[in-house]
C-alpha cells in the first residue's frame, strides 16, 4: 500500500474517534442539525475504518507467518498462510481504494422521482405507470417510503407525468443513474394485429434539497397561482382552489401540485419539488462539464440520452451505457433492480479510479 493512502486511512481512523467523542457530548444531542451531520459522517467513516483495521490485522498475520518460515516443522503451513494473506491484502486494498473515492455528498439523501411519458402516446403513459410501480417496489424492498407528490393521469391508465418522493437513507446514491430515456418494446393491449410498438418515457432522479442550506429561493422570484384541482379527464374533484402552481421566473421552471385537499400542503410539496429541480439543474450542469472532461459513460446527467430498453417479447432489459443485457424482465419490473444499479455504480467507480490514476 502506498504511504499516501496509508496516511489518509490513518487520518480517517483518528477522525472517527473524534466524531464519536463529539456525538457523546450533550451539546450535540441538543442541536439536531449538527447531530444529523455528525451521524451521517460517522456512517461514511465506519466502513472505511473497519476495512483498514482488517487490512492491518492481515498485515500482522502475514508478518507472523513470515517468521514461522524459519521453523522447518511450520514451514508448509506458513507458506499456505502467506499465500492466503497476500491474496487477502490485495483484495482489501482494492476495496479500500473504492472506499476512498470522492463521495457524492448527495448519495445519502432522499430523492424526487419524475417520470414523463414521451413518444408513444397512451402506451408511453401506461409504461410511465409501470416504471413508477417498478421503482416503488424496489423502494419498498429496501424499506424506503414512497409519497406521491404530483400526478397527471392518462385517461387509459398510467401517467402523462408523475412525481414521487422516495424517502430513505442512500436512496439517491442507489438510483441516481436511472435518469434518462427508457424505451419499451411490446405489443399494446389495444393492438389487434399483434404488432410490437416502441415508446419511451423520460426519468429524472433528483436529490432532495436541504431546506436550510442547499438552495436559496427568493420569494420575489416566484409567481404562485391557485386553481381548482381536477382528476383524470378534467373533472373537478373539489370546490375550493386547493391546487397550486409555482413558477420560478428566472429559470421558467413550473411546478404544480393538486393531490392534497389542503392548499397549504400542496404549496409545501410544490416548493420541495421546485427546490429539488433547482438543485438538480446545478448538478446536471456540473455533471455535464465533468463528463465531457473525463468522457464518462454513466454519470453524464443527460436526460435525452437513451439509457435502457425493455423488450417484452424477448423478456430482456438492456442498459446501453454499460452494454449489460439481463433476461429477467419480469423480475426487474417487479422491482428487482439490484443487479442493474450495482453494475452502474461499479462502472462509475471504475471510471473514477481510472480518472484518479496514481493518486489512489
Curated annotation (Swiss-Prot):
Pfam families: PCRF, RF-1. Residues 284-303 are annotated as: Disordered. GO terms for cellular component: cytoplasm. Keywords: Cytoplasm, Methylation, Protein biosynthesis. InterPro entries: PCRF (IPR005139), Pep_chain_release_fac_I (IPR000352), Pep_chain_release_fac_I_sf (IPR045853), Prokaryotic/Mito_RF (IPR050057), RF-1 (IPR004373). GO terms for molecular function: translation release factor activity, codon specific. The modification N5-methylglutamine is found at residue 235. Peptide chain release factor 1 directs the termination of translation in response to the peptide chain termination codons UAG and UAA. Belongs to the prokaryotic/mitochondrial release factor family. This is Peptide chain release factor 1.
Amino acid at each position: 500500500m502506498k504511504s499516501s493512502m496509508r496516511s489518509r486511512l490513518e487520518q480517517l481512523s483518528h477522525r472517527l474517534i473524534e466524531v464519536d467523542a463529539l456525538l457523546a457530548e450533550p451539546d450535540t444531542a441538543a442541536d439536531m442539525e449538527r447531530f444529523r451531520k455528525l451521524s451521517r459522517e460517522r456512517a461514511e467513516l465506519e466502513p472505511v475504518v473497519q476495512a483498514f483495521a482488517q487490512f492491518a490485522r492481515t498485515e500482522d498475520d502475514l508478518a507472523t507467518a513470515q517468521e514461522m518460515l524459519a521453523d522447518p516443522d511450520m514451514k508448509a503451513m506458513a507458506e499456505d498462510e502467506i499465500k492466503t494473506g497476500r491474496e487477502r491484502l490485495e483484495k482489501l486494498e482494492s476495496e479500500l481504494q473504492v472506499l476512498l473515492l470522492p463521495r457524492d455528498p448527495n448519495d445519502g439523501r432522499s430523492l424526487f422521482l419524475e417520470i414523463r411519458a414521451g413518444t408513444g402516446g397512451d402506451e408511453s403513459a401506461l409504461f410511465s405507470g409501470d416504471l413508477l410501480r417498478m421503482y416503488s417496489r424496489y423502494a419498498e424492498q429496501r424499506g424506503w417510503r414512497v409519497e406521491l407528490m404530483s400526478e397527471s393521469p392518462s385517461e387509459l391508465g398510467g401517467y402523462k407525468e408523475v412525481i414521487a418522493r422516495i424517502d430513505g437513507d442512500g436512496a439517491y446514491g442507489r438510483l441516481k443513474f436511472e435518469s434518462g430515456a427508457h424505451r419499451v418494446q411490446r405489443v399494446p393491449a389495444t393492438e389487434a394485429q399483434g404488432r410490437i410498438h416502441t415508446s419511451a418515457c423520460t426519468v429524472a432522479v433528483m436529490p432532495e434539497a436541504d431546506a436550510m442550506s442547499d438552495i436559496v429561493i427568493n420569494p420575489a422570484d416566484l409567481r404562485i397561482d391557485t386553481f381548482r384541482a381536477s382528476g383524470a379527464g378534467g373533472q373537478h374533484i373539489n370546490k375550493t382552489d386547493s391546487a397550486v402552481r409555482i413558477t420560478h421566473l428566472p429559470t421558467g421552471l413550473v411546478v404544480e401540485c393538486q393531490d392534497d385537499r389542503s392548499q397549504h400542503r400542496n404549496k409545501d410539496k410544490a416548493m420541495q419539488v421546485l427546490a429539488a429541480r433547482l438543485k438538480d439543474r446545478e448538478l446536471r450542469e456540473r455533471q455535464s462539464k465533468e463528463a465531457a472532461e473525463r468522457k464518462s459513460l454513466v454519470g453524464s446527467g443527460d436526460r435525452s440520452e437513451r439509457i435502457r430498453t425493455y423488450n417484452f417479447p424477448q423478456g430482456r432489459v438492456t442498459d446501453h451505457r454499460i452494454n449489460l443485457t439481463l433476461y429477467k424482465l419480469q423480475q426487474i419490473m417487479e422491482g428487482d433492480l439490484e443487479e442493474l444499479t450495482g453494475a452502474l455504480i461499479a462502472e462509475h467507480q471504475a471510471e473514477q479510479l481510472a480518472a484518479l490514476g496514481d493518486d489512489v
